[in-house]
Amino acid sequence: ETGAAEEAARRIAKLPSLSLVGLHSHIGSQIFDSSGFEVAAGRIVALAQRLHEEQGIDIAELNLGGGMGIAYVDSDDPINVADMAAQIGRIVSRACSDAGIDEPTLAFEPGRAIVGPAGITLYEVGTIKPVELDSGVFRTYVSVDDGMSDNIRTALYGAEYSVRLASRSSSAPPMLCRVVGKHCESGDVVVRDAWLPEDLAPGDLLAVA
């Protein structure tokens, strides 16, 4: 802790046009373990206690932010947001009681956890090209009609996604390929390793989630 939050609170307390009503934290993104939120809850209640005791400021709301992860691939194991919120609520209630301060409203920002599982991106297949690698093996590149301009996460973070042929069914054997975008950039990768039917053709639609 740097003390920056307490300094900001002191400045707000001196301004008659402002009222400090809440504290906010953000611990990260695509989180699959609730322990970080539990630590943040304890620290933010401790800060609320200091503000109450040292400056007479009563905090009405604690916002622990978002970052709850969702399942992009089968190995991802998301937090149950409702269960986590109930657990954090108990932690905050107990911590406030121990600190001798009123229990504030507890808020979260589970944006991706709510809307992410409902969203699918559709791409149209363009060029399909086997490319020989240095080892003498071939990798099939499947280009699509967009890429890093609508989703930069693969290039920046190495994010992984699931991809399926969406416009038709196919009984063709699967082939290992790399789905790439349309931009003039070597890092424009949509899905790094994807198993798609060998009869994949330009004009097919791929669903990425």
Question: What role is predicted for each listed range?
Answer:
Residues 1-61, 70, 91, 96, ...:
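Active-site-proximal beta-alpha core segment in soluble small-molecule metabolic enzymes
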Residues 18-34, 72-80, 162-165, 171, ...:
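A broadly tuned preference for mixed-charge, low-complexity surface segments
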Residues 25-32, 62, 67-69, 73, ...:
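Active-site beta-loop-alpha junctions enriched in small/polar residues
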Residues 33-40, 71-84, 115-127, 193-196:
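Short glycine/threonine-rich loop-to-helix capping motif typified by GTGT followed
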Residues 35, 56, 74-76, 100, ...:
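Short linear functional motifs in flexible/disordered or boundary regions
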Residues 79-96:
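Glycine-rich and small/hydrophobic secondary-structure elements
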Residues 87, 93, 101-209:
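Charged (often Lys/Glu-rich) extended helix/loop segments that serve as interaction or gating elements
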